[in-house]
Amino acid sequence: TTEIYTLSLHDALPIFVASGKGGVGKSTVAANLAVTIARSGYKTALVDADIYGPSIPRMYGIEDANPEIIKFGEKESIFPVEKYGVKVISIGFFVDRKQSLIWRGPMAANAIKQLYENTFWEDIDYMIIDFPPGTGDIQLTTIQDLNLKGAVIVTTPQEISLNDARKAASMFTTKDLEVPILGIIENMSWFTPVNHPEEKYYLFGKGGGHKMAKEFNTWLLGQVPLVMEVGEAAEKGLTIFNQKNTCIIDAFEKIAGTLLSNIEKVS
């Protein structure tokens, strides 16, 4: 007989990657963070819970994937798609990508919960959840439904982005939720030309990530440079490990190492 598992809420360490607004590179960070952790030797899963803008399938080059669904009696389990050593599930596998989803909060939150619970994960160490941007009903319901290990907040250095990121961090740390903030990732910290890796141009200001980490008494996990090749690679389904500019690989390896260390500290 074949036994189909669903993930017990205590079998893996679920980590939300969140932002207060769109456009800060949250999904790109989540996608590359998951690959970096997997390359460190851990069994890693990535849940694309960005329900209104699922972009992980495109970033991993698996847009046309069709996850297998196995039914045993009354129970159905979805087999995740594996790419770059990461087991991936996304709402994008099950909806027409040419149509926009118009779901109310409870329906959207329930869809995220089903992705999380009804998938055959099998021996996962870390689960990265690419969380919808914002601080509304979907976010609150999902946080309450899932047994989270912690959240990582993605922001860019400028104040307008930091203001929204603060709202996201405050949501996680309310008395009703009390989800630990495992750290801040400052994305697009500076621009570095591929032919001049030692040069830094601070296009969006400087020091925002440090400032926010201090405000919330948490860690600045790292600063990710703005590298044009990252966006171009994502459009082709490639990760940071498929390009020449190694400064961004160094940044993500540092972030992953610090994040995993911080998880041990809050355990």
Question: Where in the sequence are the language-model features?
Answer:
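Conserved catalytic-core segment of NTP-binding enzymes
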Residues: D125-Y126, P132-E232
